[in-house]
């Protein structure tokens, strides 16, 4: 086999591979000899079929198998011998001329094919002990713990029917019918809908108009849908809701005590506080870790400047751009609405894609040099987490990861990256800084790994790399009329 390099331009490589016809024929003859005693051909005893006859009958099919195997297996071996790693699967090209292909299958012509690929650049790792980061720490107060417990208690609060009129904090059970321009709209009708006044679960202006109503009252409520409402046919529109109040119920008093803890399935209020404190600390810890990662990635970005494989950059850009356009379509906005242009956005996100690819290669090299691996147990836990997100679709998800090439990499990559980050955090210079909750959760655009501008569409793209720690509370339950459908479609951070 002869390998000739025909292109070496930057990271791009092209190779011409030539396997002499004689070598191909020799391999074919070996295979035919292996099956000689197994084939059954009328007129010949087992094992007595002449080699020429066997070749005439099966030669081309065996040669076709050889060609497929060579194209499948040789590229990786060739790159390994050259000490190169391909950024993506090498592109293989063979002759498309039928006459020439027939000659190859008949061992009358050399088998030639070309490989086109981009190499992963060699990365010389640098010491990281010069990286300095600030770890923001929030001290969770007793008041914050109690405040969170009260929210939990309120979600489990009981209500008792009352005879008087509805007030703030009361639960109103009602039937309603929503209309725009006097015409009912889809999702605007419900019966026995429950709404706690002051919960802000329905669109602005709705709940306040329930105050003062009692069971049996009927009223027409006038509201205006927010301009950013997800349903484009309702956004910014004036609407009316025909309301029939069926019950008004007052909330029971809520106290933070052992009785509340028992109601929530715990043995004491101290245990309840311990659990809630741990949850809050975990939430803050996640935000802190994201900020630490951003600081490390920003400094690694300054340390490593090299050409990134264009095919990887193209693929990353396509993913980002697809998400950006999806976000714009869902919000009903344009690039102009976001105070930018499509060309400017493309340039910005192209730079972001290049940054991501470069940093991904650096992290991969760090992990490889440190012999960091992802265990089968870790992969199983990641798969289980995926299954929990899609109840009822477990078989389809398992089949997808089992049968889709590269799908398991989507499970492995985040685990690998977090383990590499653990290593880096243990080696860089870390200074702890006590901050307030507000300071920790304040949006830090300049430090965001995605470098988003102050545009909502761009902020959404940022979430692919840097999940926000403070999730937005979902809008109402199934009461579609006055809720924001964004709770179903929105961000899961």
UniProtKB/Swiss-Prot annotation:
Annotated function: Involved in protein export. Acts as a chaperone by maintaining the newly synthesized protein in an open conformation. Functions as a peptidyl-prolyl cis-trans isomerase.
Disordered, as annotated region: 439-493
UniProt catalytic activity: [protein]-peptidylproline (omega=180) = [protein]-peptidylproline (omega=0)
GO biological process: one example: cell division
Name used for this protein in its record: Trigger factor
UniProt KW Repressor keyword: no
Entry's EC annotation: 5.2.1.8
Main location, first listed in the record: cytoplasm
GO molecular function terms attached to this record: peptidyl-prolyl cis-trans isomerase activity; protein folding chaperone; ribosome binding
Localisation: Cytoplasm
Gene: tig
Annotated family: Belongs to the FKBP-type PPIase family. Tig subfamily.
Residue ranges occupied by any PPIase FKBP-type domain in the UniProt entry: 169-254
Keywords from the UniProt entry: Cell cycle, Cell division, Chaperone, Cytoplasm, Isomerase, Rotamase
Alphabetized PROSITE patterns for the sequence: FKBP_PPIASE
InterPro entries: PPIase_dom_sf (IPR046357), PPIase_FKBP_dom (IPR001179), Trig_fac (IPR005215), Trigger_fac_C (IPR008880), Trigger_fac_C_sf (IPR037041), Trigger_fac_ribosome-bd_bac (IPR008881), Trigger_fac_ribosome-bd_sf (IPR036611), Trigger_fact/SurA_dom_sf (IPR027304)
Entry-linked Pfam families: FKBP_C, Trigger_C, Trigger_N
GO cellular component assignments: cytoplasm
EC top class named in words: isomerase
Annotated organism of origin: Allorhizobium ampelinum (strain ATCC BAA-846 / DSM 112012 / S4) (Agrobacterium vitis (strain S4))
Domain notes: Consists of 3 domains; the N-terminus binds the ribosome, the middle domain has PPIase activity, while the C-terminus has intrinsic chaperone activity on its own.
NCBIfam families for this protein: tig
Keyword flag Transport: no
């Amino acid at each position: 086999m002869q390998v000739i390099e025909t292109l070496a331009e930057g990271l791009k490589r092209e190779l011409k591979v030539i396997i002499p016809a004689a070598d191909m024929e020799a391999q074919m003859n070996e295979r035919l000899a292996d099956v000689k005693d197994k084939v059954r051909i009328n007129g010949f005893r087992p094992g007595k079929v002449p080699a020429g006859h066997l070749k005439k009958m099966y030669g081309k099919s065996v040669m076709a198998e050889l060609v497929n195997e060579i194209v499948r297996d040789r590229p990786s071996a060739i790159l390994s011998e050259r000490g190169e790693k391909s950024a993506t699967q090498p592109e293989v090209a063979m002759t498309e001329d039928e006459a020439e292909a027939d000659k190859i299958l008949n061992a009358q012509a050399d088998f030639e094919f070309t490989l086109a690929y981009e190499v992963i650049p060699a990365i010389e790792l640098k010491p990281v002990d010069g990286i300095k980061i600030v770890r923001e720490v929030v001290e969770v107060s007793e008041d914050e713990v109690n405040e969170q417990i009260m929210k939990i208690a309120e979600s489990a609060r009981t209500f008792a029917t009352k005879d008087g009129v509805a007030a703030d904090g009361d639960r109103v059970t009602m039937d309603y019918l929503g209309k725009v321009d006097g015409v009912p709209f889809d999702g605007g009708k419900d019966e026995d809908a429950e709404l706690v006044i002051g919960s802000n679960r329905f669109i602005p202006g709705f709940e306040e108009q329930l105050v003062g109503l009692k069971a049996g009252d009927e009223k027409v409520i006038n509201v205006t849908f927010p301009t950013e409402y997800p349903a484009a046919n309702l956004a910014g529109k004036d609407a009316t809701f025909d309301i029939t109040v069926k019950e008004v119920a007052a909330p029971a008093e809520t106290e933070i005590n052992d009785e509340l803890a028992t109601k929530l399935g715990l043995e004491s209020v101290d245990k309840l506080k311990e659990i809630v404190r741990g949850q809050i600390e975990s939430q803050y810890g996640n935000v802190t870790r994201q900020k630490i990662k951003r600081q490390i990635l920003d400094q690694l970005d300054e340390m490593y400047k090299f050409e990134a494989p264009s095919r990887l950059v193209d693929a990353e850009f396509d993913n980002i751009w697809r998400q950006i356009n999806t976000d714009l379509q869902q919000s009903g906005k344009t690039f102009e609405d976001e105070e930018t242009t499509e060309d400017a956005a493309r340039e910005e996100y192209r730079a972001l894609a290049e940054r991501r690819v470069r940093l991904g290669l650096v992290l991969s090299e760090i992990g490889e040099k440190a012999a960091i691996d992802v265990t089968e147990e870790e992969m199983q836990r990641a798969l289980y987490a995926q299954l929990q997100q899609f109840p009822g679709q477990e078989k389809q998800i398992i089949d997808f990861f089992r049968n889709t090439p590269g799908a398991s990499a989507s499970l492995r990559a985040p685990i690998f990256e977090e383990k590499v980050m653990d290593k880096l955090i243990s080696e860089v210079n870390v200074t702890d800084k006590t901050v307030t909750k507000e300071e920790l959760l304040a949006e830090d655009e300049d430090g965001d790994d995605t470098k988003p501008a102050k545009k909502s569409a761009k902020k959404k793209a940022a979430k692919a790399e840097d999940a926000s720690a403070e999730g937005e509370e979902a809008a109402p339950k199934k009461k579609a009329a006055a809720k924001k459908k964004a709770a179903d479609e929105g961000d899961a951070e």
